Amino acid sequence: MAFDKLGRFFGISNDDDELEKEEYTTSNKDENENLPLNSVSRDNIVSIKSGLNSAKSKIVLYEPRVYSDAKDVAQNLLNNKAVVINFSRMEDSSARRIVDFITGTVYALNGEIQRIGDKIFLATPPKFVTDGKISDLVDKKDNLS
């Protein structure tokens, strides 16, 4: 090897070695091209089902009593969990403050917050999809009474 480098430096090279190397590399490429697709290594293939099963969606039910409980609700949203929040056991002023805090959290995460009942809200992270309206059902119930 050292002699080859020295020979190339002075412009003297052994062309026979280069020809053998070229023939070897071209024949190797031809062999790889003729292999069937089934014999190719599949180390980088992952089942889609295994990825779906690892991420389970959860919905957390929460009844805050004080303003500091808003941090727990926000933490659940950060952990990609939807949260149903019932404010029936809180004063309206404290409930408004928590709704404002959670609205900011949801906005920062690109999620959604929806009113689903009297003093009940649903806050969802961005990967959750909600469909339909409960308010239509509540209006029909009021008309029946």
UniProtKB/Swiss-Prot annotation:
UniProt keywords (A-Z) are: Cell cycle, Cell division, Cytoplasm, Septation
Q: Name one GO biological process term.
A: FtsZ-dependent cytokinesis
TM stretches of this protein: none
Q: Which GO terms describe its cellular component?
A: cytoplasm
Compartment annotation: Cytoplasm
Similarity field: Belongs to the SepF family.
Please name the PANTHER family in this protein's record: CELL DIVISION PROTEIN SEPF
Q: What is this protein called?
A: Cell division protein SepF
